[in-house]
């Protein structure tokens, strides 16, 4: 919270992977939000949060922190588009991993923007976003874009998936510009913003 209040980051979320177990490839996703990409590595360290701690206390904290988790991977994304019907952070997050040929990137972003404009307000999603992966680049990546669907509860998500739709031919053609590689659902554990 202190890093948010000090303006170092703008948000910090912890999401639990729905239906994950100890055998799953991961159980938790931590999302750190920054306003400017230059701020991403602006981390003054744990001592700035606990300035009165001794070196021994800091070392003990770092050892416990490292022993309590295994970081599987990190990804760096830039938000390209978003929409929200409310100020609060919804409780359910769906991360949709997309693969788009670099030559089709701008057309894909425009397609998502048009789809958002025509469908978001009438959907049961509380928030939506699209992000571009910026830490790695190239056709060999498994995914390079992500869309986020956020719902207030699991029932809204499940109800959105029950119906099977026949897409209009033009929209179906637009969707061919990307492959939806996979989707992962998460439940909010905590979401911190400026107080």
Regions found by a protein language model. Give the residues of each.
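Short S/T/G/P-rich N-terminal loop/turn motif that feeds into the first structured element of a domain
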Residues: 1-195
């Amino acid at each position: 919270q202190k890093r948010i209040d000090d303006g170092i980051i703008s948000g910090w979320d912890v999401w639990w992977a729905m239906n994950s177990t100890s055998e799953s490839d991961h159980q938790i996703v931590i999302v750190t939000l920054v306003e400017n990409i230059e701020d991403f590595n602006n981390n003054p360290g744990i001592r700035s949060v606990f300035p009165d701690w001794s070196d021994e206390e800091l070392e003990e904290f770092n050892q416990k922190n490292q022993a309590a988790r295994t970081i599987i991977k990190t990804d760096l994304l830039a938000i390209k588009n978003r929409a929200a019907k409310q100020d609060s952070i919804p409780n359910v997050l769906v991360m949709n991993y997309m693969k788009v040929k670099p030559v089709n990137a701008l057309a894909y972003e425009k397609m998502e923007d048009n789809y958002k404009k025509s469908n978001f307000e009438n959907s049961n999603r509380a928030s939506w976003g699209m992000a571009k992966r910026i830490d790695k680049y190239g056709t060999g990546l498994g995914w390079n874009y992500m869309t986020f669907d956020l719902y207030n509860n699991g029932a809204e998500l499940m109800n959105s998936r029950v119906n099977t739709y026949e897409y209009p031919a033009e929209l179906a053609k637009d969707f061919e510009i990307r492959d939806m590689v996979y989707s992962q659902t998460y439940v909010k554990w905590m979401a911190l913003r400026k107080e």
